[in-house]
Structure formats: structure tokens, C-alpha cells
A protein has these predicted regions:
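Surface-exposed loop/turn segments flanking beta-strands in extracellular/periplasmic regions
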Residues: 1-8, 53-68, 109-136
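Extended hydrophobic secondary-structure segments that form protein cores and membrane-embedded regions
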Residues: 96-102
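N-terminal active-site segment of His-dependent metallophosphoesterases
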Residues: 105
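Feature captures outer-membrane beta-barrel proteins of Gram-negative bacteria and organelles
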Residues: 180-186
Length: 186
């Protein structure tokens, strides 16, 4: 016999995971001095994920040694945007100008560990296992930031012109090449 008994194994082994997520969005628009509007927008996402697996040392695939595995992942990300806009009508002429700033931030913390050689049967805690077979942990961060402006003009809702400029930076690139400029005219 290979020591397998599915019902008994299912009763003794444990597989567990949990996830928590919190998300939120907020914005406010404030109008002032007749033609100005300031807008503030933001969102946030927080996530935690935990996975655990326990294999008993009495019967089944982990007979004689036992097995435990734990993985923890924590994510945090947010975006913030600030805009200042000015709009004005001069007879048949309409002019709009906007300037803004936006930033994004992402962070991940990841930890994983696997151990074997269970000391006391049925205790599914890392401290109850003596030999680490796998261990990994890392942090990842990614950020972007942008500054931008746009001007629009229209005459009598017939002729239109627009120009925009944007300067964006990303943490994924080397500091010598982190920022880029983008523009359009039409």
C-alpha cells in the first residue's frame, strides 16, 4: 500500500486562502472667480491575499515529513489628479485652458515559504516544521507622474483649434531616460 486514504487525507490536510480588498474613489470640483474650476480626483485600492497549505505527516503525499506552505501578498495602489481649468466665452469666440498634474503609485510586498519535517502532528504553524525547502520575498514599486496642459479655441462652433503638451515620468526607466515629452496640435 502507498499509504493513501483520500477521506482521511482530506480530513487531516488543510488548504486555506483569504483575500481582503478595499477600494475607494473621491472627487471634488470647486468653481471660483467666474470662469475657473479646480478638480481633485483620487482612487485607492488595497488588497491582501493569504494562501496556506498544510499536508500532514501521517498519511498521504507528505507521509513521514509533513508539509506547510504560506504565501502573503499585499498590494497598494493609488492615483491622484489635480486639474485647473479656465473657460470663457467672448461673443462668438470660446477659449478653454487647462493645466494638470497626475501621479500613480503601486507597491507589492510578496512573501512565500515552504517547510517540511513536522515536529508535532496536526499543528499547522510554520514554527512546527524544522526544514525550510523554499523561501522568497520581494518588494515591487512602480510610479508614474505627469504634468500637462491643453488650450482650445472655437469660433462660432465652426472653426476649432487645439494644442496640448504633456511631460510624463515613469520609475520603470533609468533616471537618464525617465521623462518624456508629448505634444499635439490640431
Amino acid at each position: 500500500s502507498n499509504g493513501r486514504h483520500l477521506l482521511w487525507e482530506s480530513e487531516k490536510n488543510k488548504l486555506w486562502n483569504a483575500a481582503n480588498t478595499l477600494q475607494g474613489n473621491a472627487y471634488v470640483d470647486v468653481s471660483f472667480l467666474r470662469d475657473f474650476t479646480f478638480s481633485l480626483k483620487g482612487n485607492i485600492s488595497l488588497r491582501n491575499i493569504e494562501d496556506s497549505q498544510y499536508g500532514n505527516a501521517e498519511i498521504g503525499a507528505y507521509k513521514d515529513t509533513g508539509f506547510i506552505s504560506k504565501i502573503d501578498q499585499e498590494y497598494k495602489e493609488y492615483t491622484l489628479q489635480q486639474l485647473l481649468a479656465w473657460k470663457h466665452q467672448f461673443g462668438r469666440h470660446f477659449v478653454e485652458w487647462m493645466v494638470g498634474h497626475e501621479n500613480y503609485d503601486y507597491k507589492l510586498n510578496f512573501d512565500a515559504i515552504q517547510k517540511k519535517n513536522e515536529s508535532f502532528p496536526g499543528i499547522d504553524e510554520l514554527s512546527n516544521f524544522t526544514t525550510t525547502t523554499y523561501s522568497e520575498g520581494y518588494k515591487d514599486t512602480y510610479r508614474t507622474e505627469g504634468h500637462f496642459t491643453r488650450a482650445r479655441y472655437d469660433y462660432n462652433e465652426t472653426y476649432f483649434a487645439e494644442a496640448s503638451f504633456r511631460r510624463d515620468g515613469s520609475s520603470i526607466f533609468h533616471t537618464d531616460h525617465r521623462w518624456g515629452n508629448f505634444w499635439s496640435v490640431g
